[in-house]
Amino acid sequence: MMDFTENPGAEAHVFEAPEVRLLERDEIRARRRPRAWFATWLWETAFALAVATPIQTWAGTAWGAHPEGDAPLFREGGRALLAWLGEPGPALPIVVVSTFAVFVVAVLTGQLVFGALVAALSTGVGSRATEPRLATSISAGLRALGACSTASLLAGTLQLGVLASAIFASSFAESWLDDHLGEANAFYVQLTLILVATAMAGAMGVFGDLVKVALVRDVAESSLTRESVSSRTRRALALAFHAIRIHPSLALGAWGWRAALSTLLVGIGALALHKTSLQGGAALGAVVLAHQAIGGARLALRASWLARALKLVTP
């Protein structure tokens, strides 16, 4: 039996558990949070399957008895696909509604997963900053769910508005540009307009991410206090504005190269799928593995960007 009479504080010292704390800027590393990565990957995989299940079931029912399965749907020209989609009956509306419902649920729960991942990236346990429990990160993500969802909705609306305005303006001015600049020059002007709008939408997305990670970090820091969403949002906006004003090239560059690489990976995956879509066996298995590898790599890039964003908004 241990004797604590000589040192009354020894018992408290022995049984004292390390507390979850906010990480300093140089402690934030995405690679140090494998459990959060794995949980996020599981969620993405589960909801990808859930979104694809209605149409996959419908296709299996309609084309399961075909000698080639659903391979005709992927042939060039899309005649079989268009004929199938044009068939009368309630199947298509049911599939569209059910797929959309699952997609909406995925988007909403995605904000919770985002918050949990950022909470795991921004907090640690004890002096060694070990990864917090998954339940602790989910709790922080749940508390930040409303604010993050609102920020995502506003940022997404602004991004779509900018892109839609650019496309509309480009189409509206097409005939005038053709008459005054010539068809070739008009095309380059329209392309430049679309590219500028895309860059603006990307910058809005960067700012939105900075606001959201600042919100989650603030929630994690204020876990024991009750505070209005508006006050937390004001602080998050101030931190995001400060980060984008002081380090604009760092923020945009850190997001930009990761977004470009992520898009390139999607293109590689799509090309591999196109090359092997009509094959089976080992080729199909390789595509499935490649798809999961690409998904994991894109998740790593996303987590890496969020870690960088956290560093930018950490005072």
Tell where the protein language model's regions lie, with residue ranges.
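Hydrophobic alpha-helical membrane segments
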Residues: M2-P315
